[in-house]
């Protein structure tokens, strides 16, 4: 009797439970297992760790094989903290059909973030994004890292490794150019029309005496004059860098960077002759009188003359000097600030040393070429706002700005050579023309994108937009047909491949004509979009979700990763009416 009761219970359970299980199993077999399992969750693909060691924050990603991070999408921002410069590895070049040449990072990524100052409760926001080689891309991932308090002291440039007890090398903010470039800039400024003709006069004032001096004495006096001038410039560099270090956090603000860029552009325009920048004439006259009172020929007098000469800025030196000072202030690097200005002054003084030793015969003849040197420095100064604006506008716009600057410089140089009759100049003109063409390539690709490059999101299908969970629920409730929800983002390469190769296929479009089409664009990564992705349990893109007429997701029908037109059509035939 008991055995019969047990058999009856078993048959009832089978009758009730088996259809559901069977239906689910049938759906799995019919549509194939959900392809979500093909891809790892974001924490499995990019395992992220962090550790603060004194005033250094160490970030680490363990990147799973066949996955990669986009170098340009790694962003680190401090909240209540001032962070130093973070150097990212170059990565490997990756040619993408839709985004062009990009750099990606594989295997492992370790970054050391200098913390110059951190308030109590400060945090660091770390954003990163990556994809799988199979074409599956993850939304931008943001992690908030808490920081321990770090006081802004003179020792904050030397992070202490609390694990080993060893002091790491000082962390400084690197400048875009080596300070040694300042030496070449100083030499170049010496050959501008406001400076070069003055060297014979300055040489006579430095030597002072009419009797013949020994070469050693002449070299000593000229070097003393240059060192006096260099001292003034070095002190200016140290003062400005110290001020910049104190207000470095404010100087990183976008509005400040834009203001500095405008000032650099104004300084560059003065080098092109649009207007003149110099000290007020009354101040220059007084400084000149003080300089003339010094006794030429004596070491002390010549040193004072050089120190005062460093304050007398001619129209040709004001703009380059101001540009260097502004950039030093923005970098906040005292060592580089003082050294850069010293080398700049030394470069300006080298022609003077040669004139005092060998006379005027070593100086080139004056001519229009000196004005060309001055204008060339205008282009050099224009490079500085590009460096600053690139931080705000991003890498893509930075390349376009460099492109525009390259076109302007090579075009200007080409125009200067057109009047030359010399045969060898034709080769120079060809090189300059090639420079114009190469520089124009990024702008050309932006204005006239190559075939296959999508500048705006356009679809071959007529999707109804869905912005959030409420929109999706409303659309599902109203639709008398099955529903296909396409989750799209501009940063998703495979999403663009779906648009170009799959949704444009006539057979696919014919099947989809009997289905309500919805699309959620999650490019902006807003909170409501993230909530939608979380509700649908979407790991990454592309993801396409199918719902039945009751608004329920059809088991096993979800698509993750790219499918070509033939594969997608076969998938649709399994459940489309």
From Swiss-Prot:
SUPFAM superfamilies reported in the protein's UniProt record: Thiol:disulfide interchange protein DsbD, N-terminal domain (DsbD-alpha), Thioredoxin-like
Regions that span the bilayer: 182-202, 225-245, 255-275, 308-328, 338-358, 369-389, 396-416
Enzyme Commission code(s) on record: 1.8.1.8
Ranges of residues in domain Thioredoxin: 437-577
Disulfide linkage: 131-137, 194-316, 492-495
Top EC class for this record: oxidoreductase
CDD domains: DsbDgamma
Signal peptide segment: 1-23
Compartment(s): Cell inner membrane
GO CC terms, sorted: plasma membrane
Keyword Cytoplasm: no
Keyword terms, alphabetized: Cell inner membrane, Cell membrane, Cytochrome c-type biogenesis, Disulfide bond, Electron transport, Membrane, NAD, Oxidoreductase, Redox-active center, Signal, Transmembrane, Transmembrane helix, Transport
Major site of localization recorded for this protein: membrane
Reactions mediated catalytically: [protein]-dithiol + NAD(+) = [protein]-disulfide + NADH + H(+); [protein]-dithiol + NADP(+) = [protein]-disulfide + NADPH + H(+)
Entry membrane topology: Multi-pass membrane protein
Role: Required to facilitate the formation of correct disulfide bonds in some periplasmic proteins and for the assembly of the periplasmic c-type cytochromes. Acts by transferring electrons from cytoplasmic thioredoxin to the periplasm. This transfer involves a cascade of disulfide bond formation and reduction steps.
Membership in a protein family: Belongs to the thioredoxin family. DsbD subfamily.
Name of the protein in question: Thiol:disulfide interchange protein DsbD
Native species: Pectobacterium atrosepticum (strain SCRI 1043 / ATCC BAA-672) (Erwinia carotovora subsp. atroseptica)
């Amino acid at each position: 009797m008991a055995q019969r009761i047990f058999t009856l219970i078993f048959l009832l359970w089978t009758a009730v439970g088996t259809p559901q299980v069977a239906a689910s199993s049938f759906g799995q077999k019919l549509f194939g297992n959900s392809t979500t399992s093909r891809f790892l969750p974001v924490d499995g693909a990019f395992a992220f760790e962090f550790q603060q060691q004194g005033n250094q924050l160490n970030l680490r990603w363990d990147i799973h094989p066949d996955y990669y991070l986009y170098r340009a999408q790694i962003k680190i921002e401090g909240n209540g903290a001032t962070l130093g410069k973070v150097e990212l590895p170059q990565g490997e070049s990756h040619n993408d059909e839709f985004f062009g040449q990009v750099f990606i990072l594989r295997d492992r990524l370790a970054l050391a973030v200098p913390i110059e100052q951190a308030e109590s409760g400060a945090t660091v926001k770390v954003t990163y994004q990556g994809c799988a080689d199979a074409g599956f891309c993850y939304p931008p991932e943001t992690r908030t890292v808490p920081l321990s308090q770090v006081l802004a002291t003179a020792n904050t440039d030397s992070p202490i490794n609390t694990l080993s007890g060893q002091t790491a090398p000082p962390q400084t903010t690197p400048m875009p150019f080596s300070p040694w470039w300042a030496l070449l800039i100083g030499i170049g400024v010496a050959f501008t029309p406001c400076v070069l003709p003055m060297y014979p006069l300055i040489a006579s004032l430095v030597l002072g005496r009419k009797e013949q001096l020994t070469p050693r004495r002449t070299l000593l006096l000229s070097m003393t004059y240059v060192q006096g001038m260099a001292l003034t410039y070095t002190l200016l560099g140290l003062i400005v860098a110290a001020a910049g270090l104190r207000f470095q956090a404010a100087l990183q603000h976008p509005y400040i960077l834009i203001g500095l860029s405008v000032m650099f552009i104004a300084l560059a325009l003065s080098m092109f002759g649009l207007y003149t920048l110099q000290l007020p004439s009354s101040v220059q006259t007084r400084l000149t009188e003080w300089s003339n009172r010094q006794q030429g020929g004596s070491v002390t007098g010549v040193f004072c003359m050089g120190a005062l000469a460093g304050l007398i800025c001619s129209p040709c030196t004001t703009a380059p000097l101001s540009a260097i000072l502004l950039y030093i202030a923005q970098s906040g690097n005292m060592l580089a600030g003082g050294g850069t200005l010293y080398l700049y002054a030394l470069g300006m003084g080298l022609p003077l040393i040669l004139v005092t030793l060998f006379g005027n015969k070593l100086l080139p003849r004056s001519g229009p070429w000196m004005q060309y040197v001055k204008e060339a420095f205008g282009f050099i100064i224009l490079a500085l706002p590009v460096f600053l604006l690139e931080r705000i506008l991003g890498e893509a716009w930075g390349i376009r700005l460099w492109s525009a600057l390259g076109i302007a410089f090579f075009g200007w140089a080409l125009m200067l050579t057109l009047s030359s009759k010399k045969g060898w100049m034709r080769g120079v003109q060809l090189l300059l023309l090639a420079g114009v063409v190469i520089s124009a390539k990024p702008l050309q690709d932006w204005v006239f994108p190559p075939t296959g490059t999508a500048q705006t999101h356009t679809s071959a299908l007529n999707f109804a937009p869905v912005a959030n969970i409420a929109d999706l629920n409303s659309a599902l409730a109203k639709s008398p047909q099955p529903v296909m929800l396409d989750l799209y983002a501009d940063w998703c390469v495979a999403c663009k491949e779906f648009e170009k190769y799959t949704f444009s296929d006539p057979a696919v479009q014919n099947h989809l004509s009997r289905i309500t089409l919805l699309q959620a664009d999650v490019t902006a990564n807003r909170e409501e979009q993230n909530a939608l992705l979380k509700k649908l349990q979407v790991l990454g893109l592309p993801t396409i979700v199918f719902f039945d007429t009751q608004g329920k997701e059809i088991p096993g029908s979800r698509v993750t990763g790219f499918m070509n037109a033939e594969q997608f059509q076969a998938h649709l035939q399994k459940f489309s009416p």
